[in-house]
Amino acid sequence: MDYQRLTISGQAIVVAFDMCSSSNIIEDLTKSRNVQPLTTFYGGLKRYLAKEQKATAPFDPYKFTGDGWLLLFPANTDGARLLRFLENLCLYFAVEFRRSLLPHLSHRPALVGIRFGVDKGELIPLTMYGQQEYVGRAINVACRLQAAVMDRERRPTAYTALVSNRVYSEYFAETKPHRVVKVTRNLRNINGGAEFACRRLWLLRPYLSTDDAN
């Protein structure tokens, strides 16, 4: 199934996600000279995302980042559908990783899964080298949130998201994530170095108990 590009204008929800332990996984497969399972895995993930564009919520698969994607959702996306998309993606990844990638690794990575950063804001379209590109603070914030998901954790966990308070209040406040916690993070070059208040969402059970680190 082919993916569809979606034209984004004005406000948009930016979802950044990547694969945990990707550097170790790539190194493992490279050492064994067997990188085909990784390309096959990413090809399957691309097809899954194309299917979800029609089945769950339309979005623009804006950019592949080497170990994840930047996805752009229209501002009028339904919050329940957006949450379902994130949860379904976690389920797909967990099953497919165990089925098609893990058997080819020499050892199981310490942390398996995906992590997300989500923000909303104005995106400015531009053409660069003949390609549709976007600039906007929301892209920077979503990427920083994704990178900061596991900061301050005593025991890192995957299948979680850091979402800005704006995204939470506009899209997720009336939904039912498995678990939500108020947290703060220091995001590089965001908020002038001040603490950035956000929410952490657990998207796949089992999750950490309430007395574990935020």
Spans of model-derived segments:
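Intrinsically disordered, glycine/charged-rich C-terminal tails and inter-domain linkers
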Residues: 1-4, 151-214
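Glycine-rich, phosphate-binding/catalytic loops in enzymes
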Residues: 31-34, 134-136, 179-180, 194
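A contiguous pocket-lining binding segment that forms or flanks enzyme active sites
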Residues: 138, 142-151
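Alpha-helix/helix-capping structural signal
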Residues: 20, 24, 121-123, 166
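Acidic, metal/cofactor-coordinating or nucleic-acid-engaging core segments within structured domains
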Residues: 47-50, 81, 85-102, 154-160
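Catalytic core of nucleotidyl cyclases, primarily class III adenylyl/guanylyl cyclases
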Residues: 53-81, 99-137
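Catalytic NTP-binding/metal-coordinating core of nucleotidyl cyclase/transferase enzymes
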Residues: 1-88
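Short glycine-aspartate micro-motif
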Residues: 14-16, 113-115, 162
